[in-house]
Amino acid sequence: MTATILVADDDAAIRTVLNQALSRAG
Protein backbone atom coordinates (compact mmCIF):
# COMPACT_ATOMS: atom_id res chain seq x y z
CA MET A 1 0.00 0.00 0.00
CA THR A 2 2.93 2.31 0.68
CA ALA A 3 4.13 1.84 -2.88
CA THR A 4 0.75 2.93 -4.21
CA ILE A 5 0.88 6.09 -2.10
CA LEU A 6 4.39 6.86 -3.32
CA VAL A 7 3.39 6.38 -6.95
CA ALA A 8 0.39 8.66 -6.52
CA ASP A 9 2.35 11.29 -4.58
CA ASP A 10 5.71 11.28 -6.37
CA ASP A 11 4.78 9.97 -9.80
CA ALA A 12 7.20 12.31 -11.57
CA ALA A 13 10.13 11.32 -9.35
CA ILE A 14 9.43 7.61 -9.81
CA ARG A 15 9.17 8.04 -13.58
CA THR A 16 12.59 9.71 -13.55
CA VAL A 17 14.09 6.79 -11.62
CA LEU A 18 12.44 4.27 -13.95
CA ASN A 19 13.73 6.16 -16.98
CA GLN A 20 17.28 6.07 -15.59
CA ALA A 21 16.99 2.33 -14.90
CA LEU A 22 15.67 1.68 -18.41
CA SER A 23 18.48 3.76 -19.90
CA ARG A 24 21.08 1.68 -18.06
CA ALA A 25 19.35 -1.59 -18.98
CA GLY A 26 18.91 -0.68 -22.63
Curated annotation (Swiss-Prot):
- A GO cellular-component term linked to this record: cytoplasm
Q: How is it modified after translation?
A: Phosphorylated and dephosphorylated by NtrB.
Q: Which cysteines are joined by disulfide bonds?
A: none
Task: Supply the alphabetized keyword list.
Answer: Activator, ATP-binding, Cytoplasm, DNA-binding, Nitrogen fixation, Nucleotide-binding, Phosphoprotein, Repressor, Transcription, Transcription regulation, Two-component regulatory system
Residue ranges the record marks as coiled coil: none
Q: Where in the cell is it found?
A: Cytoplasm
Q: Which positions fall inside the Response regulatory domain?
A: 4-26
- GO-annotated molecular function: ATP binding; DNA binding
Q: GO annotations under biological process? A: nitrogen fixation; phosphorelay signal transduction system
Could you confirm whether the keyword Zinc appears in this record? no
Its biological purpose is as follows: Member of the two-component regulatory system NtrB/NtrC, which controls expression of the nitrogen-regulated (ntr) genes in response to nitrogen limitation. Phosphorylated NtrC binds directly to DNA and stimulates the formation of open promoter-sigma54-RNA polymerase complexes.
Q: What is this protein called?
A: DNA-binding transcriptional regulator NtrC
Which species?
A: Rhizobium leguminosarum bv. phaseoli
